[in-house]
Amino acid sequence: LINSEQDTESFKSIGTYVEIIDFNNLPNGLLGITVKGMHRVEIKSAKKDEDGLNTGSISPISEPSVDDQALLAKFPELINVLVQLKNHPKIRELPIEIDLSSADSVSYHLGGLIPLTPLDKQLLLDAFDAGQRLNILSRLIEEISSEKPST
């Protein structure tokens, strides 16, 4: 995510290392790319080359250990939402493996499947651990569910 709060163009300091798992030509002539997030990374440096390509150096971020069972027990509603999403026909087509006994897996997959703004997705990436992500997701889902549909 590009940091637009600064005068000069820069990147947020936390991102995701991804692997390309599929690509296809879209009707508008662009190339659609499907990626799988592998792990969080810290962006150490970034620069824009003469041809406009952004390059940089990164280092992986180790996830802190959490008590998955105790943490997930605090958020049964989030697991329920994720199970419902996981069973949706369009989601079942995706090559994702969700471990419902892992707080990291639940928080990252739920954050990737619900409609969030780029800033909210960055907020999840910036969270220290799965506990913070689950707290943020709980609040965001509550906000989404309390929004009145536009007529």
Question: What kind of region is each of these model predictions?
Answer:
Residues 1-151:
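N-terminal low-complexity, acidic/polar interaction/targeting segments
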